[in-house]
């Protein structure tokens, strides 16, 4: 009788061992799997650049800008003495510099006539220029939208965001002509100022893009700029969402956002 029971135990023990091994393998796969494998696919804007250049011969058309998750999908023009940025009716973005090729830092500006909102500004088709850029101040939006597409000279460049910040106007570094040491200093400050920590490596050997707009986030009497920085991805580099977390300085943002719809006043 005891021998029969002993024989019956072996298959059960074997099955149990197999189940344990399978569970361990599945657990390892779940742990080693990236937190998010969502990727971004470039939508070329080469034809849009060509068409806009043909239609607008009075402007120096630099290229095209497209920002993930927003309706920012506009031409980039060069600001000159002959072009009044404040009087243009088209939706556009602009640059103050006109280098022949991609520099260490590309700086692009856009108007914002809206104040902060109680929710990300991504659902209203009437929003224009850089009015939806401020949506990146919201953590959930920032972690799900990380890519900036910039088309110039027949090339669709892709940048991945590594810094989102609000800075005083006098702290704004506007030049794109930075040497490696200057870029190194800029990157340190940009990463320090950022409200989010992106799991992205960036250094002075990279090329970056900076998007800048005005905001009344801290009130109408304070001259504040909203700024996003992204690093250029190489052609063979996959555009995969990185891990994003809030930093301790994000607490001041959370306090302001408690104002809800009262923040939406434009005056």
Language model features: what each stretch is:
Residues 1-2, 158:
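Intrinsically disordered, low-complexity sequence elements enriched in Ser/Thr/Gly/Pro
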Residues 3-20:
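N-terminal Sec-pathway targeting helices
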Residues 27-267:
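Solvent-exposed, non-transmembrane regions of membrane-associated and secreted proteins
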